[in-house]
From Swiss-Prot:
Lineage: Eukaryota, Metazoa, Ecdysozoa, Arthropoda, Hexapoda
Top-rank taxon: Eukaryota
Sections of the chain in a coiled coil: 51-119
Main location group: nucleus
GO-annotated cellular components: Ndc80 complex; nucleus
UniProt function note: Acts as a component of the essential kinetochore-associated Ndc80 complex, which is required for chromosome segregation and spindle checkpoint activity during meiosis and mitosis. Required for kinetochore integrity and the organization of stable microtubule binding sites in the outer plate of the kinetochore. Participates in SAC signaling that responds specifically to disruptions in spindle microtubule dynamics. The NDC80 complex synergistically enhances the affinity of the SKA1 complex for microtubules and may allow the NDC80 complex to track depolymerizing microtubules.
Quaternary structure note: Component of the Ndc80 complex, which is composed of Ndc80, Nuf2 and Spc25.
Family according to the record: Belongs to the SPC25 family.
Localization, UniProt: Nucleus; Chromosome, Centromere, Kinetochore
The protein's name: Kinetochore protein Spc25
Keywords: Cell cycle, Cell division, Centromere, Chromosome, Coiled coil, Kinetochore, Meiosis, Mitosis, Nucleus
Gene, per the UniProt record: Spc25
Gene Ontology terms describing biological process: cell division; meiotic metaphase chromosome alignment; meiotic spindle organization; mitotic metaphase chromosome alignment
Length: 223
């Protein structure tokens, strides 16, 4: 038969302290685990925050680049619109200038044609426009009481001697050579404007000066 020895109050206190210590150690272990888990979670959160910040930084950089690009495009479009408007205004101004020049050219041509008709009637001379500017071709009609006298002419526009002789002959027949020369010169101008290339031949460019012969020059008195 076992003998039961009752615990003393001291032993009970020691045992209670021991059990309390075990519970505290268990609680401490749990607390340490929770702290470790918290720190681990906190580190994960910090890393996630850093990753998010990096992404945000990249996005902000992209947004800034896109904004700068958009601003450049807007500026380019504004400059382009201004340039287009300026070009439009220049084109309108050029069209107006061309219109004015054409109108002036028509007026000048009409005036020249009227002058040609007047000189043609005054001198009784018809100039073949199709032959100009290479040749001076036509006919001068001298009105007479009984019959008219026809004086045809067909000369190279550069034939200064031939033109000079023709002018002297017409002058001897009381034809106003000055008006005759004006007629041929104006007809030459019209023909050159209608047919002249971008760079007219030298002989054509010299036609006008050749036709306007000075009857007082020594050459005019050789015949």
């Amino acid at each position: 038969m076992a003998i039961i020895i009752p615990e003393s109050s001291y032993e009970r206190r020691v045992k209670a302290l021991y059990e309390k210590q075990i519970r505290m150690e268990a609680l401490e272990g749990k607390f340490i685990k929770k702290v470790y888990k918290f720190n681990s979670n906190l580190l994960d959160v910090k890393e996630a925050v850093l990753r998010h910040q990096r992404k945000v930084g990249k996005l902000q950089k992209v947004v800034m680049e896109r904004r700068e690009e958009l601003e450049k495009r807007v500026s380019f479009m504004e400059e382009l619109a201004q340039e287009l408007e300026a070009t439009k205004l220049r084109n309108l101004a050029m069209k107006e200038q061309i219109k004015q020049r054409k109108m002036i050219a028509r007026q000048r041509k009409n005036e020249i044609m009227e002058r040609i008709q007047t000189l043609s009637k005054t001198t009784g001379t018809y100039v073949n426009q199709e032959a100009l500017p290479a040749r001076v071709k036509g006919v001068t009609v001298l009105r007479g009481d009984k019959r008219d006298q026809l004086i045809p002419f067909d000369l190279n526009a550069t034939d200064a001697e031939g033109l000079n002789s023709l002018c002297q002959h017409l002058e001897s027949l009381n034809v106003d050579v000055s008006q005759w020369q004006q007629l041929v010169s104006l007809a030459m101008d019209v023909a050159m404007e209608a047919r002249a290339p971008t760079t007219p031949p030298k002989e054509v460019a010299n036609c006008k000066s050749i036709i306007e012969i000075d009857l007082t020059s020594p050459t005019s008195h050789q015949a």
